[in-house]
C-alpha cells in the first residue's frame, strides 16, 4: 500500500494525511476512546415511538393534520409503513423538528452545485454564512473568494468557518486576503493549539458543508470548495479500472441539495452554534432569521452532530432507516468503516427481504480506508446485501433513499470518524417526488458501477486480503 503524502489532494476528501494521521491516532489513544451508543433497541423495534410532530410557519400541526400529511405521502408510494414506523421512531431519537413547507432541489454533480451556489452568492443582500471542510486556493476557491470579497465590499456580512485540517495546504495568504477584505473567519480547531480560542481537540474536525444566503436559501451535502468539482463526473466512459492517482486528477461524483423554506432557519441555528462553540461569541441576531414563508411541500429535518453530542441523531437515524425499511434501502458512501451495529442493521434488513444496495468507490484518495471498507464485504454479501463499486469518477456522495419516500443527503460517511469524531450535517427529506429523483440518480450511478458477488470476492488475491486485515485493526481512527 502506498503511504498517503502531504499534498492538497491527499486531504481533498477527508482529513487523513501522511504525518498527521499517526500523531492524531497516538493522541487519541492516550486520551481515551469514545464509543457509539447501544442501539439494539432500535434494531429490535423496542423504541418507545412518539407521535410525529410537524412544524409549520403557523406553528405545530395537530395530531390529526400531521397524520393527514403523512397519509397523503404514503398513498403515493403504495403499501409501506416507512412513514408510520420510521417517522415515529425518528421523532423519539432526535430533538430536531420536522419542518413542513420546503422546496428542495437535487444537485447531482459538481459543476451544477458550484453554479447554483455562486448564483446564490451573487444575489446576497444581507449576509452569507459559509461552513466548509475544505476550501482550496485553486481556480474554484479563488472564484469563491473573489465573489465573497466583492459582496463584502457591497455591504453584505460574510462569515466563513473552515476546518484547520481540511485547509491544511491552503496557503495562509489565501485567508489573509479574505480577512483583509472584511470577511469574518473562524479556523475550526486549529492544528496549532496556541491558536485555539476554546478547548483544543485535534481529533475533532468540522466535516460539514453548508452555505446560507440571507437566511432564505441553504445548500448542503458532500461538496467542498475544490477544483475536483469544477468538471462533470457524469460523462460515461469505457474505462473500468482506476487508481488512487485518478482520485487526485478526475472529477468527483458528489451530491448536494438546495433548500428554501422554513427549515432554513434550523440550518442557520446549526451554523451559529458552531460559531459560538468555536469563538464564544453569540451571533444569534434577528438579522439571521428573516420571516420565512412556505416554498414547497417537502418535510425536512436538519440533523447536526458533534463529537461531544449526547443523542447521536445522525447515527441513530441511519440505524432506524435500515431497521424500519419495508422495500428497499439504497445507499452511497465515500468512506465505509462502520461499527458492528450498522453492519447488523444492514444484514437484518437484507435477511427480511429488503433490497439493500450500497455503492462504494472503486478507487479512493485514501487507500487505507478503501481496504478497511472492503474488509466488511464478505460478511455483508453472505447476508444478501448487494455491493457495487463505481468506476471512473471518484464517488464522494453520502446519500440514502428508502422505500420511495425517505431520503437523506449530507456530509456523514458511514464510518466511525463521521459518527464519533466529526461535526457533521445531514438533511432528512420526506417527499415522494424528491425520493424519485434520488432513486433515479442512484440508478444512474448503478449503471456506472460493477457488482461485487460473493463468489468473485472470495477469489481476490492474498495481498488484498492482507491489506484489509492490516487496516481493519485501525478502524476506530480512520
Regions inferred by a protein language model and the residue ranges of each:
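N-terminal secretory signal peptides that target proteins for export/translocation
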Residues: 1-15
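Sequence-pattern detector for short linear motifs
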Residues: 11-12, 19, 211-212
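Sec-dependent signal peptide recognition
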Residues: 17-24
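C-terminal motif of bacterial Sec signal peptides marking the signal peptidase cleavage site
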Residues: 29-32
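Charged, low-complexity intrinsically disordered terminal segments
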Residues: 34-478
Amino acid at each position: 500500500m502506498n503511504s498517503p503524502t502531504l499534498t492538497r489532494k491527499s486531504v481533498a476528501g477527508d482529513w487523513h494525511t501522511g504525518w498527521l494521521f499517526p500523531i492524531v491516532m497516538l493522541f487519541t489513544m492516550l486520551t481515551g476512546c469514545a464509543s457509539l451508543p447501544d442501539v439494539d433497541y432500535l434494531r429490535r423495534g423496542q423504541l418507545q415511538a412518539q407521535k410525529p410532530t410537524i412544524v409549520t410557519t403557523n406553528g405545530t400541526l395537530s395530531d390529526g393534520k400531521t397524520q393527514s400529511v403523512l397519509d397523503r405521502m404514503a398513498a403515493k408510494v403504495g403499501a409501506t409503513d416507512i412513514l408510520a414506523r420510521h417517522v415515529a421512531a425518528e421523532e423519539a431519537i432526535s430533538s430536531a423538528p420536522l419542518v413542513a413547507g420546503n422546496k428542495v432541489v437535487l444537485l447531482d454533480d459538481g459543476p451544477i452545485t458550484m453554479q447554483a451556489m455562486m448564483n446564490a452568492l451573487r444575489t446576497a443582500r444581507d449576509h452569507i454564512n459559509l461552513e466548509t471542510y475544505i476550501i482550496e486556493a485553486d481556480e474554484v476557491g479563488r472564484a469563491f473568494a473573489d465573489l465573497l470579497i466583492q459582496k463584502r465590499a457591497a455591504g453584505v456580512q460574510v462569515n466563513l468557518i473552515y476546518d484547520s485540517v481540511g485547509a491544511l495546504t491552503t496557503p495562509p495568504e489565501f485567508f489573509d486576503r479574505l480577512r483583509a477584505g472584511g470577511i469574518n473567519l473562524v479556523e475550526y480547531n486549529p492544528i496549532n493549539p496556541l491558536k485555539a480560542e476554546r478547548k483544543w481537540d485535534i481529533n475533532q474536525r468540522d466535516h460539514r458543508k453548508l452555505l446560507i444566503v440571507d437566511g432564505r436559501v441553504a445548500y448542503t451535502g458532500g461538496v467542498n470548495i475544490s477544483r475536483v468539482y469544477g468538471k462533470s463526473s457524469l460523462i460515461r466512459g469505457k474505462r473500468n479500472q482506476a487508481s488512487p492517482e485518478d482520485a487526485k486528477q478526475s472529477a468527483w461524483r458528489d451530491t448536494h441539495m438546495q433548500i428554501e423554506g422554513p427549515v432554513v432557519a434550523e440550518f442557520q441555528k446549526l451554523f451559529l452554534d458552531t460559531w459560538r462553540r468555536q469563538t464564544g461569541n453569540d451571533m444569534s441576531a434577528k438579522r439571521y432569521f428573516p420571516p420565512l414563508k412556505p416554498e414547497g411541500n417537502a418535510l425536512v429535518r436538519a440533523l447536526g452532530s458533534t463529537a461531544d453530542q449526547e443523542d447521536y441523531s445522525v447515527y441513530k437515524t441511519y440505524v432506524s432507516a435500515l431497521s424500519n425499511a419495508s422495500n428497499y434501502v439504497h445507499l452511497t458512501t465515500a468512506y465505509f468503516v462502520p461499527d458492528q451495529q450498522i453492519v447488523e442493521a444492514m444484514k437484518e434488513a437484507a435477511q427480511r427481504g429488503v433490497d439493500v444496495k450500497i455503492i462504494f468507490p472503486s478507487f479512493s484518495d485514501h487507500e487505507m480506508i478503501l481496504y478497511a471498507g472492503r474488509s466488511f464485504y464478505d460478511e455483508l454479501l453472505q447476508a444478501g446485501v448487494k455491493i457495487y463499486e463505481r468506476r471512473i469518477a471518484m464517488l464522494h456522495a453520502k446519500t440514502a433513499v428508502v422505500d420511495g419516500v425517505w431520503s437523506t443527503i449530507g456530509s456523514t460517511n458511514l464510518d466511525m470518524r463521521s459518527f464519533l469524531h466529526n461535526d457533521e450535517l445531514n438533511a432528512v427529506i420526506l417527499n415522494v417526488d424528491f425520493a424519485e429523483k434520488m432513486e433515479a440518480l442512484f440508478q444512474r450511478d448503478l449503471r456506472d458501477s460493477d457488482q461485487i458477488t460473493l463468489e468473485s470476492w472470495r477469489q481476490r488475491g492474498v495481498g488484498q486480503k492482507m491489506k484489509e486485515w492490516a487496516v481493519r485493526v485501525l478502524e476506530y481512527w480512520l
